[in-house]
UniProtKB/Swiss-Prot annotation:
Family from the record: Belongs to the MYST (SAS/MOZ) family.
Upper taxonomic lineage: Eukaryota, Metazoa, Chordata, Craniata, Vertebrata
Protein's recorded name: Histone acetyltransferase KAT6B
Tissue/organ expression: Ubiquitously expressed.
Broad class of the protein's primary localization: nucleus
Start and end residues of each stretch annotated as Catalytic: 536-826
Alphabetical UniProt keywords: Acetylation, Activator, Acyltransferase, Chromatin regulator, Isopeptide bond, Metal-binding, Nucleus, Phosphoprotein, Repeat, Repressor, Transcription, Transcription regulation, Transferase, Ubl conjugation, Zinc, Zinc-finger
Chain ranges of the MYST-type HAT domain: 533-807
Post-translational modification: Autoacetylation at Lys-633 is required for proper function.
Record organism: Mus musculus
Basic residues bias (residue ranges): 925-944, 991-1004
C-alpha cells in the first residue's frame, strides 16, 4: 500500500504525539505542528498537510471528541504509548516518549512468564528477582539496558496482575493458572490454553444467516494481508453486518480468536444478549465473555450481576458447571436482595440497578467493552444524535447507542468511527451502569483488560440523554463520560423491556422495588424520566423564581452539566443538583446582593463592581451562568484580571441578577467591556443598552475612550451599533456647531474614535471632500431618531449622577471626580470651542475674549461631561494632534477615515483661527485653574493612589493628590501654594496651566514646543511629573481648567504597554503608567497616555472655546494624521515661537502661535501657551513635568525666551504631556517611555523607561525646567521647596526673561547648548521632550506623589510629614533663595538662549552633542549630552563624555562605550530602543529621572523629588539651571572635578554652572546640595570635557549630598536617621567604590557619582520630612519624580539621587574626599556634602553618596552612581524607593567598580520588566563605562514600583546587587 505521507514526517508526527501525551496534553493538530516545527524545523503548514496524509494512510489515528480532533499513534493508542496491537504487552502503554520506542514492541507478559517460570520459585518471584533474571538473559540485553526497563517492567507486572495473568501475593508474583469460578481464568488462552473452555453454538445461534464479510479491518483499515504491523492476519467478521477486524486490532488473544471463529461472532454494534436475545437492548450493561465474546446483560447473567466484574469474565455458557447451580442461585438471590432495595443501598449500586432495569428513564449503558484486556476495549462513543434515538424506532438499530453505520436503521450513528470499534468495545462494562437520574455523571470504566484500546469516537456528539422517548422506543442518549475514553450512552427503553433477562432471576417484586426507586430518584431531581436530549447541558436552570431554558451548553462540572435541570442560587450563583439542596442552601445562604461595592443605585436598579480577584468563585459562577446564554464565551475560570459590573433589580428580597458586563482591569487595547450578558427574563427591557452606556460612563470617568472587546458577536455587534448610532445622533442633535470632530465626540461619549468612525460610516455621515474627510450632518436622520426617542422613551436610562465610583488604579485612566469636573469644564470649553465657530472667530480676533469664551463654552458644553469625554479626549487628542502630514491615520486605521476628515476639518479651522483654540484653552485653563486646583489635587491623589502608592496617597490624598497624579499640576497646587512665590504665580498662571494641559491633549506638539521653549525646568519637572503628572497633571489640568490633562494622563503612550500586573505593582504609580509602549499605535484605544494626550490636547483646544471647537473638528481629523508631523513640527517650530526673547509672549500671541500651527503652529502655540501659563502661574512648573515631554522644544524656547520659561514651562509641561504622549505613541516611543519612567512607573517598564528617559531628557533640556518639575515632585515633599523653586525660576524666567538662560549657562555653554540643541536637538527636543514630559510626568508625579504623599502624610497624617516638609521648605527656601532665582533665571536664559536644545544650555562641552541632552545620562547636563532628540537619537551623541554625562542616558546604542552604555543604561526604555529617538527621549527621561542622570541629576532630582527643594532647588534653580547648563554640558556636572567647591556651585548657580561647563559639575553639586553653599565650588573646570558629562550626573548626586537636607523625608517609610546611616555607609563605600579616573572605569564614576550624589541623591534623599536637612527632605520627596524619570534612565538619575543622598549622608567633605578619590571632580562634592545641617543630618540618609563615585568617569556617564542606586533604595516612597533602589544599584555598581546592577535601573522603573530589560542595557553600558565595559548580567530588581526597598535592585556584584548589600553603605542602608 503506497503511503501518501512522507514516512519520515509521519515518524516525526508520531514522535510529537508521544511527546505531547507525555506532557499530559491532548495531541491536537496545533500542538503536533508546533512540536514538529520546533524540533525539526518543519513549517507548520507542511506538518499539517503531512498529518492529514498520515491520517489517510492510517499511520496516524484521528479521533474526534467533543468536536475536538486528537491524533493518536495507532500502535500506541493508550494513554502511554502502548505496545503494538498484536502484542499484548499492554503494560507498554506506559512507555513514554521516544525512548519507549525500543520497549514498544516488548511483550511484557511473555517476559514476566518466562522469568517466573525460569526462576521456578514455589511461592512466586519478587519483581527484583524477575528483573535480575531478565537482565541476565543475553538475548534481552537490548531491552534490559533501556533506561525505562525497570519502570516498564513494574508497569507490565501490575497490568498482568490486573488482567489476571499473574497473581500477586505480597511482593511475590506467580503465574495464574485460573480460578474455579472463572474469575481467575487466564485472559490469554495462549498463556493458558486449557483455561478457556471449548465453545459450542447455542441452539438459537445455529442456522442463522451470515452477512457477507467486509474484507477491510474497521480499525486499521488493513486487509487480511496486512494488519497494523503490516503482517498477514485473518479477519474476524460480524455475522450480522459483515464488519471485520483483525484479532490484534480487537485485542483478542489467540484462544479467544479461535473460539470466536468457531462461533457466530457479532461486532459490538450488533451484539445481542445471548440470554434474552434482544438485540440492542440496554447494550450499555452488556458484558462480553472473555472466552466466546458473547454478550450478556448483567441482569441476564446467571446469577445476575449488579456491577461489572473485574478482571476476566467468563459467561455461564462457557463456565464449567461447578458444585451445581444451587450455589449460584443462592448467590444470585443474595445479590438480588442486597441491591433490590433502593433505600439503604450505596448510590452507585442503585444506579447500576436502575440503569439495567430502567428502560423508560433510559438506562446508561457503557459501551466500553467488558472483555478481556486484550480485547478491543475501546469505548464506543455512541454517535446517535439525540433526535436519532427517538427516530429510530427499531430496537435493533437503537439497541446500542452506536449503531453500525452500514445499517440503514442506524440513524443514531454519527461517526463512522463507531464502526471500527471492536466487538469487545461494544461490551458494556457492567460497572459503568450509573444512575439515570443524572445526579451524577458516571464514568463507566471498562474492564481493566479492555481499557487499553480506549478510542473514543466522536464524543462531541454524545450528550447526556435529554430526549424523552416513547417508552416503547428504546432511544439511546449518549452521555459523555468524564473520561474521554468512555462514552456512556443512556439507553432509554421501556421498563418492561429492561427486564428481559433471566426472568426467573428478576422477580416482580424486584421490578417494583426498582421502579419505585427510580421514580423516587426522578422526583428528587424533579425531572421526568425521559428527558429530551437537546444537546444543551444543562438544558434547563431554575434561577430564582424563573425556570429558564438554556441556549447553549456551559462547562459546569460533568456531574452537574449532565443533569436535565440545574438549580442556581440567584444571589451567590452556586449551582446545585436538586430542589432540596437548593432549599437547604437558600436557608443558609446569607447573600442578598453580589459580593462587592454598590457603585450605582437609582430607583430599583443597582450596579455592583465585583473584583474577580476578590470574589473568584462568584465571578466564575457568573461566567458559567453567562455561557448558558452566550455562544462564544471562552473565559470561565480565569476571572482574576477582570472586574464584573453586575446589574441587579432590587426588591425586599434582595438584589436580583439582571445582567452584567466584565472588563479587564488593565487592558492594553482599552477595551471597556470583555463580555456582556442580560438574563433572558430581563431582555428587551433596555438593560443591555443600560450596561453598554454604563461601561462608557466608566470609561469617561476614567478619562479615556473605551470600546468593547473585539471581535464582537453578532448580537453584540447589533447592540453596540444601535447604541453607537443613537449616541452619535443624539450628540449631533445637541451640537450644531460647524466643526465637529471625532475627537470631540469621543471625548463627550467615551467612544473610541474607531467606533465613532465606523458608526459614522454606517450612518453615511462621513465623506471625503477636497482630499479631506468631513462629517455630513443628515438632519432627517438625526431628527427622526430624536422623534422616535421622544415617542418611546427608554425604560431604564442611566443616570450618571447616581454613580459613586472612583476609577481603578489605572494611572492614566484614573480620574477623580474633581478632575472629572475640571475635565468636564475643559471639555465643555473644548466642545464649545469646536461647536461655536463664532466664538472661535471671536477668540481669533481677541484671544483674551476667546479665553473667556472658552470658559463660557465650558459651562455651555456641560453635556460633554468632560469626565465622560475624557476617555476619548486622549484619542481625540490624538486625532487632533494628528496632522494630515503626520498621517496618524495609520495609528488608528479604523478611525482613519472619519478621524481624518474630522481632523482635517479641525486643522482647517485651526489654521483658519489657530489662536482661538490655543487662546481659549489657555484662558479657560487660567480661569479654571483656581477652582480646579483643588479638584486636581483630589484627582491627583486618586491617581496617585491607584498608580503610585495607593495607601500613601489615600492617606495623604489631599496633599499628595496634585503632585502625585500630576506632578506638574500637583506641584503648583501644593508647592505653589506653600511657596509664597509660587502661589502668586499660581494665581496668574494656573489658568495657563490648565490651558496647557488641555493643550497637551489637543496639541501635544505645541505643548512640547512650548515646554521645550518655556519649560526647561518644567521639562525636567514635566518628565518627572509626566509619569506622575500624566495623571496628576491631567488631573490638575482637569481640575485647573481642563479635564484634558487628566485625559492625557489616562491615555497611554501609543507604544507604551499597559499591564494590570504592572499597574498593580506600582499601584501608587498608576499615574505613571503612561508608557504604553507596547500598545500598537493603530489600536483604536490608544494607550492611556496617548488617549490622555489626545484628550488633553483636545481639552486644551476645548478650553479655547471657539478655537477649541474649530480645532476639535478640524484638528481631530488633522491631528490624527499630523500627530507625528505635528510633533516633529513642534520640534522645529518651537524655535521660532519660542525664540521670541519675551518668553512671556502674550497669551494671545502664544495662543495665536498655537492656532497658527494646529499642525506646526499648534506646537508653537502650545508652547507659547505653555509659556504664558508658566508666566501666569507657577503651577506651570507643576505642569513643567509634563512640559518635560517637550522639554527640548521648550528648552529652545526658554533659551530664546527666558521669560516664557516660567509660565511656558509649566504650560508646556501640561500641554507637552498629551502631545508627547501622542507623539510618543506614534513616533516617540522613547518619549513616552521616558516620561513614564520619570513618572516612576514601575508597571510599564518600557513606557516607564521611555518616560523616564524623556523626563530626563526634559530635565536635561530644561535646566530650569527640571527645577520646576522637581518642585512638582517636591511638592509632595514640601510644596514650599517646589514652589520656591518653581516660582523663583518662573519669576526669574518671567522677570529676567533671557537672563536665566545666561545665568544658567555661560554664554559659551548656552551657545554650545543652543548650537547643539538647535542643530541636533531642537526638533528632537521638541519631539522627545514632549513625549518624555508626558510620560515621565505621570511616573515622576507618581514617584513624587509617593514621596510627597508620604511627606504630605507626614505633614497631614504622619509626624514625619511636618519634618519632611520643614526640611523640604528649608531646603526649598534655601535653595530657592540661593539657587532658585539664580538658577531659574540662569536656566531659563540658558535654555532659551540654547533654544536649540535644553541640553545645550547645560552643554558645557561642545563635544557633547545635543543628543546628549536628551540622552538619559545627560539629564542634568542636558547640553553636555547632546540632546538625544527623536531626531538626533541618543546614539548621535558623539563625545563619550556626552554619553557618560548621562548615566541615565538610555542609549543602548551607546553600549559600545561606557558612555553609551550609560546612556542605554539610563532607561530601560532607552535600552530597548537605544539607537533611535528613544534614546533621545531617554535623554529627556534622563533629566527627569535622575534629575539629569549624569550631569542633570540635581535638576532632574529636583524635578523628581519635590523634597529636594533646597538642595534640589539649589539643584533645581542652580541644578536645574545647572541642569540646563549641566544638561547642556551633562559632563559638566559629572566633570566638575572641582566638586570640592560645592559652595561655588551654589554660588555659581545655574549661570555659573552653565558658563563654566567643567565647573558645572561643582555647580551641580551645589544644586544637589540644595543650598547655595556648594553651588560655586561644584564647578570643576578641571573636569571640563571628559568628566563634564559624567560629573553632571554624579555631581548632581553629589549635590544631593550637599543638599543632604533633602533626604530628610525618605518618605514616611524611611527615617531620616536611617537614611543618613544609609547615606553615610553608602557615601563611604561610594567613594571607594567609584573610581573617578575611569569613565569606562569607576574612577570617573567616583567623580561623577559625587556630583550625582549631590544632585541626584539630594533629590532622592531629599525628603519633605527633614527640614534641617532640607535637601534630604527634598531628596525623599524628589525621589518619586526622579525615580519616575529614572525608571527608564533611573539608574543614573537614581544613582545621582542616591549619590546625592549618599553624599548628603556623609559629610560633604567626606563626600568630597570620596569623590576626590574617584576623581578630582568628586572632591568638590564632598565639600558640597557638608552643604547644610540638613545635609549633614541626612548624610547617612543620603546613601546616594556612595554612588557619587559610581559614574565619575567623564566618558563613563554610564557609571551612573551605582552606589547611589543603593541610596535611593532608602526612599520610603514606594515609587521613590524603587527608584532609589535603581539608583542605588547603579551607584553601587559604579562604586564597586562593577557593572551597574540592572536591578538598580529596574527598580527605578517600578519593577517594570520591560524597562528592567532596558535597564540592563543601560546598566550594562554604564557598567562598561564604570568597569571598562565589564558587562554584568543585569538582574532586574523588579521591586514593586512602590516597594521601599533598599535592595530592590540586586546588583550583579553583591553589594551592588543589593543596592548596597555588599558595600557597607549597602548594609547600613539596607536596614532602612
Amino acid at each position: 500500500m503506497v503511503k501518501l505521507a512522507n514516512p519520515l514526517y509521519t515518524e516525526w508526527i508520531l514522535e510529537a504525539v508521544q511527546k505531547i501525551k507525555k506532557q499530559k496534553q491532548r495531541p491536537s493538530e496545533e500542538r503536533i505542528c508546533h512540536a514538529v516545527s520546533t524540533s525539526h524545523g518543519l513549517d507548520k503548514k507542511t506538518v499539517s498537510e503531512q498529518l492529514e496524509l498520515s491520517v489517510q494512510d492510517g499511520s496516524v489515528l484521528k479521533v474526534t471528541n467533543k468536536g475536538l480532533a486528537s491524533y493518536k499513534d495507532p500502535d500506541n493508542p493508550g494513554r502511554f504509548s502502548s505496545v503494538k496491537p498484536g502484542t499484548f504487552p499492554k503494560p507498554t502503554k506506559g512507555s513514554k516518549g521516544p525512548p519507549c520506542n525500543d520497549l514498544r514492541n516488548v511483550d511484557w507478559n511473555k517476559l514476566l512468564k518466562r522469568a517466573i517460570e525460569g526462576l521456578e520459585e514455589p511461592n512466586g518471584s519478587s519483581l527484583k528477582n524477575i528483573e535480575k533474571y531478565l537482565r541476565s538473559q543475553s538475548d534481552l540485553t537490548g531491552t534490559t539496558n533501556h533506561p525505562a526497563f525497570q519502570q516498564r517492567l513494574r508497569l507490565g507486572a501490575k497490568r498482568a496482575v490486573n488482567n489476571g495473568r499473574l497473581l500477586k501475593e505480597g511482593p511475590q508474583y506467580r503465574v495464574n493458572s485460573g480460578s474455579s469460578d472463572g474469575k481467575g481464568a487466564p485472559q490469554y488462552p495462549s498463556a493458558f490454553p486449557s483455561s478457556l473452555p471449548p465453545v459450542s453454538l447455542l441452539p438459537h445461534e445455529k442456522d442463522q444467516p451470515r452477512a457477507d464479510p467486509i474484507p477491510i479491518c474497521s480499525f486499521c483499515l488493513g486487509t487480511k494481508e496486512s494488519n497494523r504491523e503490516k503482517k498477514p492476519e485473518e479477519l474476524l467478521s460480524c455475522a450480522d453486518c459483515g464488519s471485520s477486524g483483525h484479532p490484534s486490532c480487537l485485542k483478542f488473544c489467540p484462544e479467544l480468536t479461535a473460539n470466536v471463529k468457531a462461533l457466530r461472532w457479532q461486532c459490538i454494534e450488533c451484539k445481542t444478549c445471548s440470554a434474552c436475545r434482544v438485540q440492542g437492548k440496554n447494550a450499555d450493561n452488556m458484558l462480553f465473555c472473555d472466552s466466546c465474546d458473547r454478550g450478556f446483560h448483567m441482569e441476564c447473567c446467571d446469577p445476575p450481576l449488579s456491577r461489572m466484574p473485574k478482571g476476566m469474565w467468563i459467561c455461564q455458557v462457557c463456565r464449567p458447571k461447578k458444585k451445581g447451580r444451587k450455589l449460584l442461585h443462592e448467590k444470585a438471590a443474595q445479590i438480588k436482595r442486597r441491591y433490590a432495595k433502593p433505600i439503604g443501598r450505596p448510590k452507585n449500586k442503585l444506579k447500576q440497578r436502575l440503569l439495567s432495569v430502567t428502560s423508560d428513564e433510559g438506562s446508561m449503558s457503557a459501551f466500553t467493552g467488558r472483555g478481556s484486556p486484550g480485547r478491543g476495549q475501546k469505548t464506543k462513543v455512541s454517535t446517535t444524535p439525540s433526535s436519532g434515538h427517538a427516530a429510530s424506532g427499531k430496537h435493533s438499530s437503537s439497541r446500542l447507542a452506536v449503531t453500525d453505520p452500514t445499517r440503514p436503521g442506524a440513524t443514531t450513528k454519527t461517526t463512522t468511527s463507531s464502526t471500527y470499534i471492536s466487538a469487545s468495545t461494544l461490551k458494556v462494562n457492567k460497572k459503568t451502569k450509573g444512575l439515570i437520574d443524572g445526579l451524577t455523571k458516571f464514568f463507566t470504566p471498562s474492564p481493566d483488560g479492555r481499557r487499553s484500546r480506549g478510542e473514543i469516537i466522536d464524543f462531541s456528539k454524545h450528550y447526556r440523554p435529554r430526549k424523552k422517548v416513547s417508552q416503547k422506543q428504546s432511544c439511546t442518549s449518549h452521555v459523555l463520560a468524564t473520561d474521554t475514553d468512555i462514552k456512556i450512552s443512556i439507553k432509554q427503553e421501556s421498563a418492561d423491556v429492561s427486564l428481559v433477562g433471566n426472568k426467573e432471576l428478576v422477580t416482580e417484586e424486584d421490578l417494583d422495588v426498582f421502579k419505585q426507586a427510580q421514580e423516587l430518584s426522578w422526583e428528587k431531581i424533579e425531572c421526568e424520566s425521559g428527558v429530551e436530549d437537546c444537546g444543551r447541558y444543562p438544558s434547563v436552570i431554575e434561577f430564582g423564581k424563573y425556570e429558564i431554558q438554556t441556549w447553549y451548553s456551559s462547562p459546569y462540572p460533568q456531574e452537574y452539566a449532565r443533569l436535565p435541570k440545574l438549580y442556581l442560587c440567584e444571589f451567590c450563583l452556586k449551582y446545585m443538583k436538586s430542589k432540596n439542596i437548593l432549599l437547604r442552601h437558600s436557608k443558609k445562604c446569607g447573600w442578598f446582593h453580589p459580593p462587592a461595592n454598590e457603585i450605582y443605585r437609582r430607583k430599583d436598579l443597582s450596579v455592583f463592581e465585583v473584583d474577580g480577584n476578590m470574589s473568584k468563585i462568584y465571578c466564575q459562577n457568573l461566567c458559567l451562568l453567562a455561557k448558558l446564554f452566550l455562544d462564544h464565551k471562552t473565559l470561565y475560570y480565569d476571572v482574576e484580571p477582570f472586574l464584573f459590573y453586575v446589574l441587579t433589580k432590587n426588591d425586599e428580597k434582595g438584589c436580583h441578577l439582571v445582567g452584567y458586563f466584565s472588563k479587564e482591569k488593565l487592558c492594553q487595547q482599552k477595551y471597556n467591556v470583555s463580555c456582556i450578558m442580560i438574563m433572558p427574563q430581563h431582555q428587551r427591557q433596555g438593560f443591555g443598552r443600560f450596561l453598554i452606556d454604563f461601561s462608557y460612563l466608566l470609561s469617561r470617568r476614567e478619562g479615556q475612550a473605551g470600546s468593547p472587546e473585539k471581535p464582537l458577536s453578532d448580537l453584540g455587534r447589533l447592540s453596540y451599533l444601535a447604541y453607537w448610532k443613537s449616541v452619535i445622533l443624539e450628540y449631533l442633535y445637541r451640537h450644531h456647531e460647524r466643526h465637529i470632530s471625532i475627537k470631540a465626540i469621543s471625548r463627550a461619549t467615551g467612544m473610541c474614535p474607531h467606533d465613532i468612525a465606523t458608526t459614522l460610516q454606517h450612518l453615511h455621515m462621513i465623506d471625503r471632500r477636497d482630499g479631506r474627510f468631513v462629517i455630513i450632518r443628515r438632519e432627517k436622520l438625526i431628527l427622526g431618531h430624536m422623534e422616535k426617542l421622544k415617542n418611546c422613551s427608554r425604560p431604564n436610562e442611566l443616570d450618571p449622577e447616581s454613580l459613586r465610583w472612583t476609577p481603578m488604579l489605572i494611572s492614566n485612566a484614573v480620574v477623580s471626580e474633581e478632575e472629572r469636573e475640571a475635565e468636564k469644564e475643559a471639555e465643555r470649553l473644548m466642545e464649545q470651542a469646536s461647536c461655536w465657530e463664532k466664538e472661535e472667530q471671536e477668540i481669533l480676533s481677541s484671544r483674551v475674549s476667546s479665553r473667556q469664551s472658552s470658559a463660557k463654552v465650558q459651562s455651555k458644553n456641560k453635556y460633554l461631561h468632560s469626565p465622560e469625554r475624557r476617555p476619548v479626549a486622549g484619542e481625540r487628542g490624538q486625532l487632533l494632534e494628528l496632522s494630515k502630514e503626520s498621517s496618524e491615520e495609520e495609528e488608528e486605521e479604523e478611525e482613519e477615515d472619519d478621524e481624518e476628515e474630522e481632523e482635517e476639518e479641525e486643522e482647517e479651522s485651526i489654521q483658519t483661527s489657530p489662536p482661538r483654540l490655543t487662546k481659549p484653552q489657555s484662558v479657560s485653563i487660567k480661569r479654571k485653574r483656581p477652582f480646579v486646583v483643588k479638584k486636581k489635587r483630589g484627582r491627583k491623589r486618586r491617581r496617585i493612589n491607584s498608580s503610585v502608592t495607593t495607601e500613601t496617597i489615600s492617606e495623604t490624598t489631599e496633599v499628595l493628590n496634585e503632585p502625585f497624579d500630576n506632578s506638574d499640576e500637583e506641584r503648583p497646587m501644593p508647592q505653589l501654594e506653600p511657596t509664597c512665590e509660587i502661589p502668586v504665580e499660581e494665581g496668574g498662571r494656573k489658568p495657563v496651566l490648565r490651558k496647557a494641559f488641555p493643550h497637551q491633549p489637543g496639541k501635544k506638539r505645541q505643548t512640547e514646543e512650548e515646554e521645550g521653549e518655556d519649560n526647561h525646568f518644567f521639562k525636567t519637572a514635566a518628565l518627572c511629573r509626566k509619569d506622575v503628572d500624566d495623571d496628576a497633571e491631567h488631573l490638575k489640568e482637569g481640575s485647573k481648567d481642563n479635564p484634558e490633562p487628566l485625559k492625557c494622563r489616562q491615555v497611554w503612550p501609543k507604544g507604551a504597554k499597559r499591564g494590570l500586573s504592572k499597574w498593580k505593582q506600582s499601584k501608587e504609580r498608576k499615574t505613571g503608567f503612561k508608557l504604553n509602549l507596547y500598545t500598537p499605535p493603530e489600536t483604536p484605544m490608544e494607550p492611556e497616555d496617548q488617549v490622555t494626550i489626545e484628550e488633553q490636547k483636545e481639552l486644551s483646544e476645548d478650553k479655547g472655546s471657539p478655537v477649541g471647537m474649530e480645532r476639535e473638528v478640524t484638528e481631530t481629523v488633522d491631528a490624527l494624521l499630523p500627530q507625528e508631523g505635528s510633533r516633529r513640527e513642534e520640534t522645529g517650530i518651537p524655535v521660532s515661537p519660542h525664540k521670541s526673547p519675551g518668553g512671556k509672549v502674550d497669551e494671545e500671541d502664544l495662543i495665536r502661535g498655537e492656532e497658527e500651527g494646529e499642525e506646526e503652529g499648534e506646537e508653537e502655540g502650545e508652547r507659547e501657551e505653555q509659556e504664558e501659563e508658566e508666566e501666569v502661574t507657577t503651577e506651570k512648573d507643576l505642569d513643567g513635568a509634563k512640559s518635560k515631554e517637550n522639554p527640548e522644544p521648550e528648552i529652545s524656547m526658554e533659551k530664546e525666551d527666558p521669560v516664557h520659561l516660567g509660565d511656558h514651562e509649566e504650560d508646556e509641561d501640561e500641554e507637552e504631556e498629551p502631545s508627547h504622549n501622542e507623539d510618543h505613541d506614534a513616533d516617540d516611543e522613547d518619549d513616552g517611555h521616558m516620561e513614564a519612567a520619570n513618572m516612576e512607573r514601575g508597571d510599564l517598564p518600557r513606557e516607564t523607561f521611555k518616560d523616564a528617559l524623556e523626563g530626563q531628557e526634559a530635565f536635561l533640556d530644561l535646566s530650569i525646567q527640571p527645577s520646576h518639575s522637581n518642585p512638582e515632585v517636591l511638592m509632595n515633599c514640601g510644596v514650599d521647596l517646589t514652589m520656591s523653586c518653581n516660582s523663583e525660576p518662573k519669576e526669574l524666567a518671567g522677570d529676567t526673561g533671557t537672563a536665566p538662560e545666561s545665568d544658567a549657562e555661560p554664554p559659551e555653554e548656552q551657545t554650545q547648548k543652543q548650537d547643539q540643541k538647535n542643530s541636533d536637538g531642537v526638533d528632537a527636543e521638541l519631539e522627545e521632550g514632549g513625549p518624555a514630559a508626558v510620560e515621565i510626568d505621570s511616573e515622576t508625579a507618581q514617584a513624587v506623589q509617593s514621596l510627597t504623599q508620604e511627606n504630605r502624610e507626614h505633614d497631614d497624617t504622619f509626624p514625619d510629614c511636618a519634618e519632611t516638609q520643614e526640611a523640604c521648605r528649608s531646603l526649598q527656601n534655601y535653595t530657592h533663595t540661593d539657587q532658585s532665582p539664580q538658577i531659574a533665571t540662569t536656566l531659563d536664559e540658558c535654555q532659551q538662549s540654547d533654544h536649540s536644545s535644553p541640553v545645550s544650555s547645560v552643554h558645557s562641552h561642545p563635544g557633547q552633542s545635543v543628543r546628549s541632552v536628551n540622552s538619559p545620562s545627560v539629564p542634568a547636563l542636558e547640553n553636555s549630552y547632546a540632546q538625544i532628540s527623536p531626531d538626533q537619537t541618543a546614539i548621535t551623541v558623539p563625545p563619550l563624555q556626552n554619553m557618560e554625562t548621562s548615566p541615565m542616558m538610555d542609549v543602548p546604542s551607546v553600549s559600545d562605550h561606557s558612555q553609551q552604555v550609560v546612556d542605554s543604561g539610563f532607561s530601560d526604555l532607552g535600552s530597548i530602543e537605544s539607537t533611535t529617538e528613544n534614546y533621545e527621549n531617554p535623554s529627556s527621561y534622563d533629566s527627569t529621572m535622575g534629575g539629569s542622570i549624569c550631569g542633570n541629576g540635581s535638576s532632574q532630582n529636583s524635578c523628581s523629588y519635590s523634597s529636594l527643594t533646597s538642595s534640589n532647588l539649589t539643584q533645581n534653580s542652580c541644578a536645574v539651571t545647572q541642569q540646563m547648563s549641566n544638561i547642556s554640558g551633562s559632563c559638566s556636572m559629572l566633570q566638575q572635578t572641582s566638586i570640592s567647591s560645592p559652595p561655588t556651585c551654589s554660588v555659581k548657580s545655574p549661570q555659573g554652572c552653565v558658563v563654566e561647563r567643567p565647573p558645572s559639575s561643582s555647580q551641580q553639586l551645589a544644586q544637589c546640595s540644595m543650598a547655595a553653599n556648594f553651588t560655586p565650588p561644584m564647578q570643576l573646570a578641571d573636569i571640563p570635557e571628559t568628566s563634564n558629562a559624567n560629573i553632571g550626573l554624579y555631581e548632581r548626586m553629589g549635590q544631593s549630598d550637599f543638599g543632604a537636607g533633602h533626604y530628610p523625608q525618605p518618605s514616611a517609610t524611611f527615617s531620616l536617621a536611617k537614611l543618613q546611616q544609609l547615606t553615610n555607609t553608602l557615601i563611604d563605600h561610594s567613594l571607594p567604590y567609584s573610581h573617578s579616573a575611569a569613565v569606562t572605569s569607576y574612577a570617573n564614576s567616583a567623580s561623577l557619582s559625587t556630583p550625582l550624589s549631590n544632585t541626584g541623591l539630594v533629590q532622592l534623599s531629599q525628603s519633605p520630612h527633614s527640614v534641617p536637612g532640607g535637601p534630604q527632605a527634598q531628596a525623599t520627596m524628589t525621589p518619586p519624580p526622579n525615580l519616575t524619570p529614572p525608571p527608564m534612565n533611573l539608574p543614573p538619575p537614581l544613582l545621582q539621587r542616591n549619590m546625592a543622598a549618599s553624599n548628603i549622608g556623609i559629610s560633604h567633605s567626606q563626600r568630597l574626599q570620596t569623590q576626590i578619590a574617584s576623581k578630582g571632580h568628586v572632591s568638590m562634592r564632598t565639600k558640597a556634602a557638608s552643604l547644610s545641617p540638613a545635609a549633614a543630618t541626612h548624610q547617612s540618609q543620603i546613601y546616594g553618596r556612595s554612588q557619587t563615585v559610581a559614574m565619575q568617569g567623564p566618558a563613563r556617564t554610564l557609571t551612573m552612581q551605582r552606589g547611589m542606586n543603593m541610596s535611593v533604595n532608602l526612599m520610603p516612597a514606594p515609587a521613590y524607593n524603587v527608584n532609589s533602589v535603581n539608583m542605588n544599584m547603579n551607584t553601587l555598581n559604579a562604586m564597586n567598580g562593577y557593572s551597574m546592577s540592572q536591578p538598580m535601573m529596574n527598580s527605578g522603573y517600578h519593577s517594570n520588566h520591560g524597562y528592567m530589560n532596558q535597564t540592563p542595557q543601560y546598566p550594562m553600558q554604564m557598567q562598561m563605562g564604570m568597569m571598562g565595559s565589564q558587562p554584568y548580567a543585569q538582574q532586574p530588581m523588579q521591586t514593586p514600583p512602590h516597594a521601599n526597598m533598599m535592595y530592590t535592585a540586586p546588583g550583579h556584584h553583591g553589594y551592588m546587587n543589593t543596592g548596597m548589600s555588599k558595600q557597607s553603605l549597602n548594609g547600613s542602608y539596607m536596614r532602612r
